[in-house]
């Protein structure tokens, strides 16, 4: 398996008490599996493999996320503390898979066990000539939060979030969570 993960971000003070932060992250992964089986016989077990076989599978996944957040902090009249957060987030995940198998290897040599060296009849129903898959998902969000406290003793918080997802039902692509 090979995996590459990274995050980049930056933050600036826009005005006194107002900050803007933007970040981008990614996760890229490649993985797979290969296998082979040569003929063998287990005496009195009834578990014989009379033909060689080989299989291979490759997978790739990619995810990215971007987030932008404005944060406002203000203390007034000595004991009143207010924080307001507004933000936007988006992410996407994509996955691809490709696989296949074959039978009747030309040689029983592990170093030569690959699908190209198998000669099973193409009409053989066991031959898994190839399959693939593709999946993706997206999520977009807008969110806000207000925090207020008096003298760091009495606190109240309100949060709202609106998400849109490719995985939500066809007539309900967006929802509000509070």
Predicted regions and their residues:
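Surface-exposed loop/turn segments flanking beta-strands in extracellular/periplasmic regions
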Residues: 1, 35-52, 96-129
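Surface-exposed extracellular loop regions of Gram-negative outer-membrane beta-barrel proteins
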Residues: 2-76, 137-178
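Histidine-centered active-site/metal-ligand motif
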Residues: 80
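Long, low-complexity, repeat-rich, intrinsically disordered, solvent-exposed domains used
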Residues: 83-87
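Glycine-rich, aromatic-flanked loop segments that form ligand/cofactor-binding clefts
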Residues: 90-94
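Flexible beta-alpha connector loops of hexameric P-loop NTPases
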Residues: 132-133
């Amino acid at each position: 398996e090979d995996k590459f993960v990274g995050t980049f971000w930056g933050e600036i003070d826009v005005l006194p008490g107002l900050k803007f932060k933007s970040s981008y992250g990614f996760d890229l992964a490649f993985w797979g599996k290969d296998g082979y089986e040569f003929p063998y016989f287990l005496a009195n077990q009834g578990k014989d493999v009379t033909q060689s076989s080989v299989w291979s599978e490759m997978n790739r996944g990619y995810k990215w996320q971007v987030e932008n957040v404005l944060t406002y902090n203000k203390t007034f009249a000595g004991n009143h503390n207010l924080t307001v957060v507004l933000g936007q987030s988006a992410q996407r995940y994509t996955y691809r898979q490709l696989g296949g198998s074959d039978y009747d290897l030309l040689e029983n040599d592990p170093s030569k066990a690959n699908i190209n060296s198998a000669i099973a009849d193409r009409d053989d129903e066991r031959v898994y000539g190839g399959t693939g898959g593709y999946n993706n998902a997206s999520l977009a969000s807008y969110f806000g939060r207000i925090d207020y406290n008096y003298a760091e003793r009495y606190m109240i918080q309100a949060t709202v979030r609106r998400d849109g997802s490719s995985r939500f039902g066809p007539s309900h692509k967006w929802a509000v969570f509070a």
